[in-house]
Amino acid sequence: MSRQLSILIFIIFALVNSYANAGDDGNLKLNENKNGYVEVGDCFEKVNRGIFGFNQVLDKVNFKPLAKGYRIFPQPIRSGTSNALSNIGNVVTIPNNVLQGQFKDAGLNSARFVINSTLGIAGIFDVASYYGIKKRDKEDYGQTLGVWGAGPGCYFVLPVLGPTTIRDSIGSVVNMIGGDAWYNVTVANDTQYFSEADYYASRLLSGVDFRAKNLESFDSLENSSVDLYASVRSLYLQDRYRKIRNIDKTTDTLSDDDWEELDTQ
């Protein structure tokens, strides 16, 4: 059985499970709490908490020190890095704009990508914003599935990668079978210009950049939370709910772009 067919079977199985809570009329019966956010089942909580604890140790030993070291670099260098990573992210955002019917945003993001990739020197400089083409909301395949009506399925925690749901994990699989142009240029089609190492280096840099932006936020969350695992789960699920419905509202602790690197599964 080919790798692509195996992945397709997994997607179908997971989608069936994500629709398991649909009523007889086919409409999803999602439970919303008093804040309006969908409550997602934590089907593997004991395992999730164990993996979360492992990730916390990994963060303290590796990512947090790397993030602190990264902050030594001058702000212009860090801003340029963030801009370049955001520019690469457009290769996932643009097709999802189209899939969600956001054709205006697809056009604007395409213009941003072309301008910043050329005049902005591989996206290091946000020239498009200078010309009035402002950064749009990031989209991904997990969000698209949500817009199409797929339920989130169970919440779970992945080693190293952190929080996700069945639906968002399917979005990550879509990247591997053609949805992420950057992945396909580097990993799937190793060329003389880009290699698999370039892709994974960019993902590692994304994680370090994300962590560096949120050193104080995470410290504050850790110090103020009675149950850190539950707090992170709540923040992640609220953020995903908000992005799928394009709600202009931030979570209690983290800023609007805080989870963007975690969303690119």
Where are the model-predicted features located?
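Short, membrane-interfacial amphipathic segments enriched in basic
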Residues: G36-V47, D59
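Alpha-helical scaffold segments that form or flank carboxylate-/histidine-based iron centers
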Residues: K46-V47, P76-N83, A106-N116
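Bacterial N-terminal signal peptides
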Residues: L8-V16
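Mid-length scaffold segments of soluble, non-membrane domains
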Residues: N87-I166
